[in-house]
């Protein structure tokens, strides 16, 4: 049998602070709400005493301590040295912070073998990378709210509307559907603004012959959604010929990559990205693009096909892109094209920036598109933008 306990160190309730900031969990809440076996004050000396007592009895230690902001990321110390510094700060005897010298010796023994100390964050990321059915239900609700909000934006777009007004529509529609907040600073990029992948000024007026790429998503019950759609801003709500051709090329790549996002096919995020590059290369050549080596990934499609999604927008960062997709993982699939005003590219497509993105929950033999409520077929987008549905 394996026995374990959960001891939470939390800030005690402070009536004066709660007067300003509202109620807090406190020690009672740690047990009653979060199910901790034991709750104690987060006073540093109390925590130090408890942690030192636990460390002397364990064979493996999983830990991540707050990093000093002045230490560059590449020079941060590994968990072994960080916990050593925390448990045994410089002192005249080397072990006077411990009750017994044997405790100090046990800590030295534990920390002397790098195989015994591990990053807790990496272990948590592995667990977080596969969502439960309930987590996926919450993410589906976030995707549905964002999808409905995206539809409302399509209904609102017209020449002369400010990007910021479209943003306000999106945020209002998310809020009235129960979203706590936006999951990130949204992109409402019309015309040539869409050539900037992370354009967030959102202060231009929509033109009559442009498209607008909207990259936005709400957070619901702590989980993020992340959706991108591209829509015409013309008075009739219809794409021009070149706009439609480029968008449909992207849409085929999105669908092709989404179809590969199942556990049984053995793909990883890296594998999906390679396939997206192959698909986009083929689509662009069919549209008359002359692609030299590296042009696609260096200029036209400089970002990755997607990222993990969950509690964080870019979730579980320590889970490698080379990790095979497993049931319960959630990822974004977001091919994009950004054609600069350069004679190297067909004139009809110059100045067009587009992206289309879905949130996908992986299953063994298929997947679930969590953002399916946001229109993405050309006919549907034009019908909504044109006020026909």
Predicted regions and their residues:
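Active-site neighborhoods and metal-handling regions in enzymes and metal-associated proteins
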Residues: 1-389
